[in-house]
Design a protein with these regions (language model features):
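Residue-level detector of short, conserved catalytic/binding motifs and their immediate flanks
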Residues: 31, 78-80, 164, 225, ...
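Acidic Ser/Thr/Pro-rich low-complexity disordered segments
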Residues: 38-49, 103-131, 177, 287-292, ...
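Short helix-loop boundary/capping segments
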Residues: 72, 80-146
Length: 778
C-alpha cells in the first residue's frame, strides 16, 4: 500500500491519499495495520511490515492537543477470513476464490490500482488498473495437520451475491472444491473482517441419510470434501442417482455399501457418476464383505441414440486415484440401451488416473442389441489420457474374479482388466494384475471385428509407452462371433506396447463347430496379434489354445499373428489345436509360439523361445498356404532364431491333392517379401504331415516343412519326421539354402546315422542348396 500525502495550513495539517492496493494478503494470514496509530496520533516511526492490511487516514475535525495532528484510520479493504477446519493429512499449495455466479458481483474482488475518497472511503478504479473476480493465493506448502486460517483482501465496496467457490489444490495433486456463503449476499464495506467462515473438508458418513446429504453436497458443487465412512451403509435398494462432481477424498475405512440400486437412463451409471480425487478402502455390493448381497445392481440403459458415449461402473468416469476398492455389484448395459459404451466392474473410463489393489467379483456384461461400439472389462472399461508425456497412468495389483461378457455384435473389445488402452494414455503401466473370470463374446449370428484379452483386449494404434508387466490370466477366454477376431490370453491386439513376464494359465479358444466365417482369426496364448514394434518378453502360456472355426486362422502358443514385432525368451506348454472338417479355401497356420509371421509392416523376430506343447492341425482347405510348426506355422516375413521345440507337430489336410506342410521349427516359409533367417534352432519333437489320399504338395521337415526363401543355418534336429512325399531330417522341400546344420532323429522310421544322414537331411531339393551338413546326435 502506497500513500501520497499533502500538507496544508503551514504544515499543521496533512492528507494521505492511498494510490495502490496490492492483493491478496500474505499467505500466512497475518494482518496488521500498515501505519500504526498511537492514541489517535500518527507516529512517523510506526511499524511498516510486509504483512499488512491496507488503511487510509484522514485528519480529525479537531486536533487532540496543541501542536499535534489527529488522524482517523480506516481499512481500505475488507478481510475474508477462511478457516480450513479439522485435521487432514494434506498439504495445501494453492487456494482460489471466485464467485459461484460471475454475474452476481458488484465491484471487483481484486483491484491493482485505485483512489480512495479520504472521507467516504469510496473507491475509484484507476484507468490502467487490472481488475479480477478471481483471487489466487499461491501458498507453496501449508500443512493441514491442524486447522489453518488464511485471509483474503477484498476491495472495499464489493458485493457478492450467490456465494463464493473455494478451490483448494494440494501438493499430492488432489483438488477440493467447496461453496462458501451459498445463496447469500456478502458485502465487503471496508470492515476489518468483512466475512469469516469455516471450511470443513472432513465429512463423516455413518447413516443412509448422511450418504444422501453427501450426494446432495456434490450435486451442489460442494464435492471437495474429505469423506470418512464410519459405518456400513445399507442403501435400502432405493433408486440411487449417481454422485456427481466428486473431487475430494473418500476414505472407506474398510466399510461396506450394499443394496445399491442404480438403473440409469442417462450417460453415467454408477455409484459415482464422475470422480476426480481419491477413493479408497471401501466395499460395494456386499453386506459381509466376502460375498454378493443378492440385490445390488448398476444398469446402463441409455436409449436416446447410438452416437453418444456412455459409461458404467462403480465410478462411471474417473479422473482420480482408486485404492483398495472392491465390488461385488453386477454391472450391465441392458438390452434396450442404444449408446456407445465403456463399462467396467470398478471404472467405466479411467482418464489420467491410478488404480491399485482394486478387486471386482461382480459380473460385467453388455447385452445391448444396438450401439456401434462397446468396451467391457472387469476393472476398467477403457484407459485414456491427455497425451501428455509428463503424465503416468497405472493399474497395479488389480484383480478381476467376475465373468465378463458381451453379446453386442458391433465394434467390440472385452477383457479381464481393461478392454482398451488408447494411444493418448501415454506412460501407462499395467502391472501385477490377475484375471480369474471367464471372458466371452457370445453372438454367433453376428459378424464384426472384435478383440478379446484376459488382461487387455485392444491396445489402440500405437502405444510404445505402454507396459504390461507380471500379469496373469486364469480365466477362460472364448468367442463364437464371426468377423475378424483377435483373441489372447493376455492381450487381443497389441500395437507397439511391451508385454513382459506375463503368464496365461487358462484355455483360449474359438468355438463355432465348423461354421464358415469371413475375415481372419488371430488367436494366441499371450496375444492374438502384435504390430508396430510390439515386444513380448519372458512370457509363458501354460494352457490349450484352440479353434474349430472355418475361417482363415493364425493360431499360436504365444502370438497368433506376428508383424513387425519381437518375441523373446517366451515359452509355451499348452496344446495348440486347429480342427475343422468342413470344406474351405482358407490359409491355415498353427505354431507352438507363433501362428503366422505377417510381412505387412516389416520383419518380425522370434528369439530364444521354447515350445513343449503339441501342435495339432486338421483342416479341409484347398488353399496352398497350409502350415504347422513347433515354433511358427507360416513365415511370410521374419526371422526365427535360437528357439527350441520339444512338442509333437502334425498337419493333416482332409482334401486330397492339396497342401500340407509341417516342420519342427517352421511349417512353411514362403516369404514373398524378402529372405527370412531360420538360425540356431533345435527340434526334438516328432513331425508329421499328411493329406487325405495323395498330394504333390506335401512335406515335413525337422526344421522346415517347405522352405521357399528361407536361409536355414546352425540348426539341429533330433526328432522323428514322417511324410508320404517329401520328408527330411532338416527340410522336407527346399527351394533355398540349408547350411551348417546337424541332421539327426529319424525320417519315415529310418534312424539317421553317420553314413545316411546326408541323403536324409533334405527330402526334395527343388533348386535349393545345402552345405556344411553334419550328423546330429545328442
Amino acid at each position: 500500500m502506497s500513500y501520497v500525502y499533502e500538507t496544508y495550513d503551514a504544515g499543521n495539517g496533512v492528507e494521505f491519499h492511498p494510490v495502490a492496493l496490492s492483493l491478496p494478503a500474505d499467505a500466512r494470514g497475518e494482518v496488521t495495520a500498515y501505519f500504526k496509530a498511537v492514541d489517535g496520533v500518527f507516529a512517523v516511526g510506526a511499524d511498516q511490515t510486509g504483512a499488512t492490511l491496507p488503511m487510509y487516514a484522514y485528519a480529525a475535525d479537531a486536533a487532540p492537543a496543541q501542536g499535534s495532528l489527529g488522524l482517523h484510520f480506516k481499512p481500505l479493504a475488507s478481510v475474508l477470513s477462511l478457516t480450513i477446519g479439522e485435521e487432514a493429512s494434506k498439504t495445501i499449495s494453492k487456494i482460489t476464490l471466485e464467485p459461484v455466479d460471475p454475474d452476481g458481483v458488484e465491484g471487483h474482488l481484486a483491484v491493482s490500482e485505485a483512489v480512495v475518497d479520504p472521507r467516504t472511503g469510496a473507491v475509484t478504479v484507476g484507468e490502467d488498473a487490472a481488475v479480477s473476480d478471481i483471487l489466487t493465493m499461491e501458498i507453496g506448502e501449508m500443512s493441514l495437520v491442524q486447522a489453518q486460517t488464511v485471509n483474503f483482501l477484498i476491495a472495499s465496496g464489493t458485493k457478492v451475491d450467490g456465494g463464493l467457490k473455494a478451490t483448494i489444490s494440494c501438493t499430492d495433486g488432489s483438488v477440493f472444491v467447496k461453496n462458501l456463503f451459498e445463496g447469500q449476499e456478502v458485502a465487503f464495506a471496508g470492515n476489518c473482517v468483512g466475512a469469516a467462515t469455516e471450511l470443513f473438508f472432513r465429512l463423516r458418513i455413518a447413516t443412509y441419510e448422511d450418504m444422501v446429504n453427501f450426494a446432495q453436497e456434490c450435486a451442489d458443487d460442494n464435492g471437495g470434501a474429505i469423506v470418512d465412512l464410519q459405518a456400513d451403509i445399507d442403501m435400502r435398494n432405493v433408486p440411487w442417482t449417481p454422485v456427481e462432481n466428486f473431487t475430494g477424498t473418500f476414505n472407506g475405512n474398510g466399510h461396506r455399501i450394499y443394496n445399491i440400486n442404480v438403473s440409469a437412463d442417462g450417460r453415467y451409471a454408477g455409484f459415482f457418476a464422475y470422480a476426480k480425487g481419491a477413493i479408497s478402502d471401501v466395499v460395494f455390493g456386499s453386506k459381509d464383505g466376502t460375498s454378493y448381497d443378492g440385490t445390488s445392481r448398476i444398469e446402463l440403459k441409455y436409449s436416446a441414440d447410438t452416437d453418444t458415449w456412455c459409461y458404467a461402473g462403480i465410478v462411471a468416469q474417473s479422473n482420480n486415484t482408486l485404492t483398495g476398492v472392491t465390488s461385488f455389484v453386477p454391472v450391465t448395459v441392458t438390452a434396450d440401451s442404444r449408446c456407445k459404451s465403456r463399462t467396467g466392474g470398478i471404472v467405466g473410463s479411467l482418464y489420467n488416473g491410478k488404480m491399485s489393489g482394486c478387486r471386482n467379483y461382480g459380473a460385467v456384461s453388455n447385452v445391448a442389441t444396438a450401439g456401434v461400439a462397446s468396451y467391457v472389462a472387469g476393472i476398467a472399461g477403457i484407459v485414456d489420457g491427455s497425451g501428455d508425456a509428463a503424465g503416468a497412468i497405472t493399474l497395479d495389483g488389480c484383480h478381476n474374479h467376475g465373468p465378463v461378457m458381451t453379446s453386442l455384435g458391433l465394434g467390440n473389445a472385452v477383457a479381464g482388466i481393461t478392454a482398451s488402452v488408447m494411444k493418448t494414455a501415454v506412460n501407462t503401466t499395467i502391472s501385477n494384475c490377475t484375471n480369474a473370470g471367464e471372458i466371452r463374446f457370445d453372438n454367433a449370428g453376428t459378424s464384426a471385428a472384435h478383440r478379446i484379452g484376459g488382461i487387455v483386449a485392444y491396445i489402440v494404434d500405437s502405444c510404445p509407452t505402454l507396459v504390461i508387466d507380471n500379469c496373469t490370466n486364469k480365466g477362460t477366454v472364448v468367442s463364437n462371433m464371426n468377423g475378424n477376431c483377435f483373441i489372447g490370453g493376455i492381450a487381443g491386439v497389441n500395437y507397439a506396447a511391451a508385454i513382459r513376464d506375463c503368464t496365461n494359465e487358462a484355455e483360449v479358444k474359438f468355438v463355432q463347430a465348423n461354421a464358415a466365417g469371413a475375415g481372419y482369426l488371430c488367436i494366441g496364448g499371450i496375444a492374438g496379434q502384435t504390430y508396430s514394434g510390439a515386444k513380448v518378453t519372458g512370457c509363458a502360456n501354460r494352457a490349450a489354445v484352440s479353434s474349430d472355426k472355418l475361417q482363415v486362422t493364425r493360431i499360436g502358443g504365444i502370438v497368433g499373428t506376428h508383424n513387425a514385432s519381437t518375441i523373446d525368451d517366451c515359452s509355451n506348454s499348452g496344446d495348440i489345436t486347429l480342427a475343422y472338417t468342413a470344406t474351405a479355401n482358407n490359409w491355415e497356420a498353427a505354431g507352438g509360439i507363433v501362428g503366422f509371421y505377417d510381412g505387412t509392416d516389416g520383419t518380425a523376430v522370434t528369439n530364444g523361445c521354447t515350445n513343449s506343447g503339441k501342435v495339432w492341425a486338421t483342416v479341409n482347405s484347398s488353399n496352398a498356404n497350409i502350415g504347422a510348426g513347433g515354433i511358427a506355422g507360416i513365415i511370410k516375413s521374419g526371422n526365427a532364431t535360437n528357439n527350441t521345440n520339444d512338442g509333437a507337430v502334425w498337419m493333416h489336410n482332409a482334401q486330397a491333392g492339396k497342401s500340407s506342410y509341417a516342420g519342427g521349427i517352421v511349417g512353411y516359409d514362403y516369404n514373398t517379401k524378402d529372405k527370412s533367417a531360420v538360425t540356431g534352432n533345435v527340434n526334438n519333437g516328432a513331425v508329421q504331415a499328411t493329406v487325405e489320399g495323395t498330394s504333390a504338395l506335401l512335406a515335413a521337415g525337422g526344421i522346415i516343412g517347405r522352405n521357399d526363401v528361407g536361409a536355414v543355418s546352425g540348426c539341429r534336429n533330433f526328432g522323428a519326421v514322417a511324410c508320404a512325399l517329401h520328408a527330411g531330417a532338416l527340410v522336407g522341400w527346399n527351394k533355398k539354402s540349408v547350411e551348417d546344420s546337424a541332421a539327426g532323429g529319424s525320417v519315415n522310421g529310418t534312424a539317421l546315422t553317420g553314413t545316411n544322414y546326408a541323403e536324409l537331411a533334405v527330402g526334395f531339393q527343388d533348386g535349393g542348396s545345402s552345405s556344411g551338413i553334419t550328423f546330429g546326435e545328442k
